[in-house]
């Protein structure tokens, strides 16, 4: 009977997962001493540099701080992850 309630519940554990991810994000930001404003400035700078080479979809652009494990010692460290949709390559002459 209890499984039937779980089946029809709206949550299905997703709010727990979302809360866990938000907590991880808060901890990463806290440990790296990275404010939301700093992350936004970093995003703007990345857009400026990459835009010299490619046309990007700024609406779909996502940059976030997360954690990853280093290969050599498996220690968790902060990581900057960027998902940058490219519309097209720009021709450059230098």
Swiss-Prot record:
Coiled coil: none annotated. Pfam families: MinE. Disulfide bonds: none annotated. The keyword Cell cycle applies. GO terms for biological process: cell division; regulation of division septum assembly. Keywords: Cell cycle, Cell division. Gene3D superfamilies: Cell division topological specificity factor MinE. InterPro entries: MinE, MinE_sf. It comes from the Bacteria. Prevents the cell division inhibition by proteins MinC and MinD at internal division sites while permitting inhibition at polar sites. This ensures cell division at the proper site by restricting the formation of a division septum at the midpoint of the long axis of the cell. Belongs to the MinE family. This is Cell division topological specificity factor. It comes from Alkaliphilus metalliredigens (strain QYMF).
């Amino acid at each position: 009977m209890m499984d039937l309630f779980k089946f029809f519940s709206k949550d299905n554990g997703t709010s727990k997962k979302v809360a866990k991810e938000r907590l991880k994000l808060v901890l990463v930001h806290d440990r790296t001493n990275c404010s939301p404003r700093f992350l936004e400035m970093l995003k703007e700078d990345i857009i400026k540099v990459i835009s010299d080479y490619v046309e990007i979809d700024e609406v779909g652009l996502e940059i976030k701080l997360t954690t990853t494990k280093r290969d050599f010692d498996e220690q968790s460290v902060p990581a900057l992850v960027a998902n940058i949709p490219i519309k097209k390559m720009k021709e450059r002459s230098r």
